[in-house]
Design a protein with these regions (language model features):
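Bacterial N-terminal signal peptides that target proteins for export
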Residues: 1-9
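N-terminal signal peptide c-region/cleavage motif recognized by signal peptidases
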Residues: 18-20
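Short, glycine-/small- and polar/acidic-enriched structural segments
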Residues: 25-165, 170-173, 177-184, 203, ...
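Short helix-capping segments at alpha-helix termini
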Residues: 49-52, 148-154, 193-196, 264-265, ...
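Pocket-lining segment of extracytoplasmic ligand-binding domains
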Residues: 85-86, 166-263
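Periplasmic-binding protein-like
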Residues: 103-113, 197-223, 277-279, 317, ...
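Secondary-structure end/capping motifs
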Residues: 225-308
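Conserved C-terminal helix/tail region of periplasmic/extracytoplasmic solute-binding proteins
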Residues: 296-329
């Protein structure tokens, strides 16, 4: 933690003590491990923005074995960071998750291809193996292939789908012509492994018109019936977005704050600074209020994801402006 954090935390604690108030507790469950993808929350904690709102926030890192929906369902968090496809799937299956804010305005999903595989345009996909993440991340891909009219059955006229792990080995080892990458993470792992940008062709889901909303904030619907909870979440969202804007303006400092909070020691300064620079492009230009048009595009993409769609009908009540209206009134 930085000296600034201790100073602000101390001042906030004194203010709370003097007023006779006690901090409201909030537990946030992240979608993945501690990294710059979640910088705004760590910055809000480090810079005292949560304390200024009278909040005591616990940030729980995620990982490959952590499903945010399961955590909040079991009472392990008040609010979670999740991608909208996962949240909508959980809602259709009976877990009433509601999006209360959308810090990520744009998607970071992309398909990164080796030029020497012969893939430099979407028309080149047939006959090749493409690496795809599953666990809910596959649906935009299948929607894209459906839009292109390309089968995913491994036929000569279609593509072979490789269930990709969370690494870039299939591309480096030529097991796949293309793999799934995030603009802020795996793409740079490919570059750091020795490949040059000019040796690669990148297809961004945003550009292909099949991007779905990624890191949003979700709560259990029933909780929103309590005005006190809505007010608490408004404070949390307001402070979190203040953290995100600070991170956009101070990307290197934000990356260092993330590193300070990485208890695993697995992250590196170089990678986190690189990541923060890309993340800032995804959060820029929004105060965290969900754009209904982005929501509709996400739903439409998911409903056209081939023979096994993540949702089977248009959701109802899956998002609200109740929190952001209070936060930014």
């Amino acid at each position: 933690m930085t000296k600034t954090w201790f100073a602000l935390a101390g001042a906030s604690a004194l203010a709370l003590f003097a007023s006779g108030a006690s901090a409201e507790e909030v537990t946030l469950q992240l979608k993945w491990v501690t990294q710059a993808q979640f910088a705004g929350y760590y910055v809000a904690q480090d810079q005292g923005f949560y304390e200024e709102e009278g909040l005591e926030v616990t940030i729980k890192p995620g990982g490959p074995d952590v499903a945010p929906a399961q955590v909040i369902s079991g009472g392990g968090a008040d609010v979670v960071v999740d991608w909208m496809p996962s949240a909508l799937a959980a809602r259709e299956k009976g877990l009433p998750l509601v999006n209360i804010a959308q810090p990520f305005k744009r998607s970071g999903m992309q398909l990164t291809c080796r030029n020497d595989s012969g893939v430099t345009a979407t028309k080149d996909f047939p006959g090749h193996t493409l690496g795809v993440w599953f666990g809910g991340n596959e649906y935009p891909f299948f929607s894209w292939m459906s839009k292109l009219g390309i089968p995913t059955d491994g036929s000569p006229q279609g593509v072979t789908v490789l269930k990709q792990g969370f690494n870039v080995d299939p591309l480096l080892q030529k097991q796949a012509a293309c793999i799934s990458t995030m603009t802020y993470n795996e793409y740079w792992q490919v570059i750091d492994a020795g490949m040059k940008p000019e040796e690669l062709t990148v297809f961004k889901y945003e550009d292909e018109g099949v991007a779905t909303l990624e890191d949003g904030l979700y709560v259990i619907e029933d909780k929103l019936k309590d005005p006190a909870f809505v007010e608490k979440m408004a404070k949390f969202v307001r402070a979190s977005m203040k953290g995100w804007k600070w991170a956009e303006e101070n990307p290197d400092d934000a990356a260092m704050i993330v590193l300070d909070n990485d208890e695993t020691g697995a992250q590196t300064e170089h990678h986190q600074k690189q990541m923060m620079g890309e993340i800032a492009k995804l959060t820029a230009g929004t105060d965290g209020t969900l754009d209904p048009a982005d929501y509709e595009r996400t739903v439409e993409t998911l409903l056209t994801a081939g023979s096994d769609p993540v949702i089977t009908k248009k959701p109802e009540g899956a998002w609200t402006h109740a929190v952001t209206d209070v936060a930014f009134k």
